[in-house]
């Protein structure tokens, strides 16, 4: 007789190998290749704060892929804004044809602030 546990990994966190040197990866979005996500494109998730220091290619990154977390804003955003990846893997308000990675759960009044976000991966924002 066989006994099976859960075969679905319901963790919000995965480990991704860094695909490049990243000076301060914490709270930045990364792609599946372990590199800082490209503006407007899909991101696998957001690097957690255990990775505050510089990482080199091949190092482990703890990446949050769902639920509520923190993301560094690349510009001012409002509570409830759909968020996409901006320059340097930071959160910006999603525009047409950019991939919606999350929803802002608090506002950022300037670039560099860390804000709470709901990671949703809602697909590409349609043109209005």
Give the ranges of each region predicted by the language model.
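Surface-exposed, low-hydrophobicity beta-strand/loop segments enriched in small/polar/acidic residues
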Residues: 1-128
């Amino acid at each position: 007789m066989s006994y099976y546990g859960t075969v679905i990994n319901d963790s919000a966190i995965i480990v991704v190998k860094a695909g490049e040197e990243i000076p301060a990866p914490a709270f930045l979005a990364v792609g599946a290749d372990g590199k800082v996500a490209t503006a407007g494109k899909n991101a696998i998730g957001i690097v957690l704060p255990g990775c505050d220091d510089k990482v080199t290619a091949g190092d482990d990154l703890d990446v949050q892929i769902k639920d509520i977390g923190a993301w560094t804003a690349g510009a001012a955003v409002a509570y409830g804004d759909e968020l996409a990846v901006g320059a340097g893997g930071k959160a910006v308000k999603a525009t047409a044809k950019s991939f919606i990675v999350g929803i802002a759960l608090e506002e950022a009044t300037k670039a560099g602030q860390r804000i709470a976000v709901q990671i949703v991966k809602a697909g590409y924002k349609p043109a209005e």
